[in-house]
């Protein structure tokens, strides 16, 4: 039985890629030096896979930024405004991802969206009338040859044409028909080139197949591959799917001339039933995704073997991961502070390679010692249940999830209490974390800085941050979050039930890596988490300072969740803990409390029929539970970013927050139309500039954005803010950008008042 994975993490076990890229962006190393780091990371990945017994090591899973962006470059799908910059290929890629600004040019970054239901983000391809598909697969071919030279016969992977078409933005009436023929031609060129190099396999990733499909989309997929597979010659082609099942098109797909089909048996709820009902062709390999590529818990071998047995008499099975391993950390080997007893329950990417091999060994060779060892792990009670917490959740009633008075009624109380101008200006929460801030936090963690000295340092930074905001002229201030390393980890560290790693980093986008905490047991709040800093900040200014919290859904979605209880139960545990913090902030005199739900959309099922019963019916009430007991005059804010929210606007309104800020700048404010169409009641702050790009927007640019918003929404409903927190930016970008934001807002206010007179 062969062993396979879909892809391996590219950031390196110590984030080597992140640090090399940041040096390159600062012009501290050359492209050649950057490429050396990349080559070392690829070699390490292939070695790890081969040593673990993987029969099909993967190539072209490496990327300097994003695999969808790599495909756009390979297909020549580069908008003219980026071509005019006359940059080399690598710097063009970075301009698309990050924007580009110099004395002569000022080009915004392309929009960034969540990759299906994960916390990874992709750069959205743009198709216009000017788009001309031109195949240049040198990256894929070079990396395949690089592996071959190093002694590894790899299976290159690439996102497929169907998923590319589904994910792309189409401008000015253009449809996929405009580029379809050339797109198929480009992949045909790749087939020929890989054949000429002696390539054995090509993996084509088509995750868009697990979304709800229309009849037209099913026909589009069949049309593409009936044409494309005629040209495969000796090359074997694997259709790889993940994040769900193929219930809309399985019967048609298995008739196509693929040599292998990869199915997800972890998130694909219907995958086993589809194979049982319609069979699986004997002339193809079934790449069975049975090792979870998205969570860090050990595989339960007995359950996996039972699943494989349920597939029936299929001889041609390859043991595979359910999705790319880029969604989990690289290895547990670096976790020297966690006990062996705890680590035994975890499998990061390298450990999942071993799991794939062991499942194959048990299945084929009936290796009972491996199976017995795994069974012993699951036979023990890992954690003790918190009976008191369970009873608290059981006794929740409908009243616990409803805030009174209503949104409209309490708005009058808030206007009176806060006395804010039209178009109130604010930021999303965090301010730039300078090397000085990170150094002090590290010294405190290591015991090199006393608690009193560290707190004095933080108080000084908060004062500076407040003074900066007052000088700029912002209306609602934040304390800057200098005490926080990460918006989830910071809370997890103060909640019982979480455990933490040292180096379990996962790529979120580009150079941005996150270290998700792990939900180990039942979650409770032993003491206040943020009150100390919010209360101190409010004591330093007469302007309102927002209390800053992360919401329960986001905390869970950006953690590695338990698999022994439901996501709903874990979320309600978190909601009760955050509710306690909200009420403590209110008691401390904080009049505006922001409860971020940046990741609300993330775990939304990919199929619309599952949205409510599987997710929204409990995730939205969990948010309401957090703030249901506050006073009418306390204003509740929330923030959401980098997802498509247009189709769940009624559910977002049902969160019953008083103000919601959205990412909107990269997506050309498209969400505004959806808000208007759904008669959205909540006050809104659509982000007026993109903080994920280093470019500085002019006040005129922000003014134009504001005017676009006010053409569609009443001025009384609008707040003005950037589209996300400022932690990852520098002061040299943040200060002028916020200054321009306030200047633009004041101009629009002045014009509005003059017009009204």
UniProtKB/Swiss-Prot annotation:
Protein known as: 5-methyltetrahydropteroyltriglutamate--homocysteine methyltransferase
Pathway(s) the chain acts in: Amino-acid biosynthesis; L-methionine biosynthesis via de novo pathway; L-methionine from L-homocysteine (MetE route): step 1/1
Residues noted as binding L-homocysteine in the record, renumbered to the chain: 428-430, 481, 596
Keyword field contains Zinc: yes
Entry keyword annotation includes DNA repair: no
Cofactor binding note: Binds 1 zinc ion per subunit.
Coiled-coil ranges per UniProt: none
InterPro entries: Cbl-indep_Met_Synth_N (IPR013215), Cobalamin-indep_Met_synthase (IPR006276), Met_Synth_C/arc (IPR002629), UROD/MetE-like_sf (IPR038071)
Function: Catalyzes the transfer of a methyl group from 5-methyltetrahydrofolate to homocysteine resulting in methionine formation.
Keywords in alphabetical order: Amino-acid biosynthesis, Metal-binding, Methionine biosynthesis, Methyltransferase, Repeat, Transferase, Zinc
Annotated GO biological process: methionine biosynthetic process; methylation
UniProt binding sites for 5-methyltetrahydropteroyltri-L-glutamate: 15-18, 114, 512-513, 558, 602
Catalytic activity line of the entry: 5-methyltetrahydropteroyltri-L-glutamate + L-homocysteine = tetrahydropteroyltri-L-glutamate + L-methionine
Molecular function in Gene Ontology: 5-methyltetrahydropteroyltriglutamate-homocysteine S-methyltransferase activity; zinc ion binding
Species for this entry: Lactococcus lactis subsp. cremoris (strain SK11)
Class in the EC hierarchy, top level: transferase
Cofactor: Zn(2+)
Pfam families assigned to the protein according to its UniProt record, in alphabetical order: Meth_synt_1, Meth_synt_2
């Amino acid at each position: 039985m062969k062993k396979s994975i879909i892809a391996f993490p590219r950031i390196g076990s110590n984030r080597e890629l992140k640090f090399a890229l940041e040096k390159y962006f600062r012009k501290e190393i050359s492209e050649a030096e950057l490429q050396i780091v990349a080559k070392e990371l690829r070699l390490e990945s292939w070695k790890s896979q081969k040593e673990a017994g993987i029969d099909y090591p993967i190539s072209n899973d490496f990327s300097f930024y994003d695999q969808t962006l790599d495909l756009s470059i390979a297909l020549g799908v580069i908008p003219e405004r980026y071509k005019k910059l006359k940059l080399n290929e690598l710097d063009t890629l970075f301009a698309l991802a990050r924007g580009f600004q110099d004395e002569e040019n000022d080009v915004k970054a392309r929009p960034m969206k969540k990759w299906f239901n994960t916390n990874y983000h992709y750069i959205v391809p743009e198709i216009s009338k000017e788009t001309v598909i031109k195949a240049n697969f040198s990256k894929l071919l070079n990396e395949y040859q690089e592996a071959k030279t190093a002694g590894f016969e790899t299976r290159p992977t690439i996102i497929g044409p169907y998923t590319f078409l589904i994910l792309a933005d189409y401008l000015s009436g253009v449809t996929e028909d405009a580029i379809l023929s050339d797109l198929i031609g480009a992949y045909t060129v790749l087939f020929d080139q890989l054949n000429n190099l002696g390539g054995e396999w090509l993996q084509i990733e088509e995750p868009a197949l697990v979304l709800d499909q229309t009849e037209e989309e099913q026909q589009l997929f069949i049309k593409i591959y009936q044409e494309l597979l005629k040209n495969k010659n000796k090359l074997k082609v694997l259709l790889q799917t993940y994040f769900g099942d193929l219930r809309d098109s399985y019967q048609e797909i298995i008739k196509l001339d693929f040599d292998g089909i990869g199915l997800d048996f972890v998130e694909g709820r219907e995958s086993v039933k589809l194979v049982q009902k319609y069979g699986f062709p004997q002339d193809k390999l079934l790449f069975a995704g049975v090792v979870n590529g998205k969570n860090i818990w050990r595989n339960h071998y007995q359950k996996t073997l039972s699943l494989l047995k349920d597939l029936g008499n299929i001889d041609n099975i390859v043991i595979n991961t359910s999705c790319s391993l880029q969604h989990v950390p690289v290895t547990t080997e670096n976790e020297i502070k966690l006990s062996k007893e705890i680590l035994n329950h975890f499998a990061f990417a390298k450990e999942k390679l071993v799991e794939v091999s062991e499942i194959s060994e048990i299945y084929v060779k009936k290796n009972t010692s491996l199976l017995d060892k795994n069974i012993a792990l699951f036979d023990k009670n890992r954690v003790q249940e918190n009976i008191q917490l369970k009873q608290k959740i059981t006794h929740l009633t409908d009243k616990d999830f409803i805030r009174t008075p209503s949104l409209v009624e309490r708005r009058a109380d808030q206007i009176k209490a806060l006395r804010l101008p039209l178009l109130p200006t604010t930021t999303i929460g965090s301010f730039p974390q300078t090397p000085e801030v990170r150094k002090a936090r590290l010294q405190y963690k290591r015991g090199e800085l006393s608690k009193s000295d560290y707190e004095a340092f933080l108080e000084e930074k908060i004062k500076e941050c407040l003074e900066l905001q007052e000088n700029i002229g912002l209306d609602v201030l934040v304390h800057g979050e200098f005490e926080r390393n990460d918006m989830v980890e910071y809370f997890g560290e103060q909640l019982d039930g979480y455990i933490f790693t040292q180096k379990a980093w996962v790529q979120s986008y580009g150079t941005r890596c996150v270290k998700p905490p792990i939900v180990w047991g039942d979650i409770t709040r032993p003491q206040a988490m943020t009150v100390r800093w919010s209360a101190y900040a409010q004591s330093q200014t007469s302007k309102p300072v927002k209390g800053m919290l992360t919401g329960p859904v986001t905390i869970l979605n950006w953690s590695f969740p338990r698999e022994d209880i439901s996501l709903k139960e874990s979320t309600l545990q978190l909601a009760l803990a955050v509710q306690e913090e909200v009420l403590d902030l209110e008691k401390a005199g904080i009049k505006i409390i922001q409860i971020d739900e940046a990741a609300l959309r993330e775990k939304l099922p990919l199929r619309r029929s599952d949205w409510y019963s599987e997710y929204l019916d409990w995730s939205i009430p969990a948010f309401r539970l957090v703030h249901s007991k506050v006073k009418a005059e306390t204003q509740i804010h929330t923030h959401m970013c980098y997802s498509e929210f247009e189709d769940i606007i009624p559910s977002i309104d049902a969160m019953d927050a008083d103000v919601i800020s959205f990412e909107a700048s990269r997506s050309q404010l498209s969400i505004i139309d959806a808000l208007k169409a759904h008669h959205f009641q909540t006050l809104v702050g659509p982000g007026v500039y993109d903080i994920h790009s280093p470019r500085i927007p002019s006040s005129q640019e922000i003014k134009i954005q504001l005017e676009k918003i006010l053409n569609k929404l009443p001025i009384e409903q609008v707040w003005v803010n950037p589209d996300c927190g400022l932690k990852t930016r520098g002061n040299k970008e943040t200060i002028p950008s916020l200054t321009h934001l306030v200047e633009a807002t004041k101009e629009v206010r002045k014009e509005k008042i003059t017009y009204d007179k």
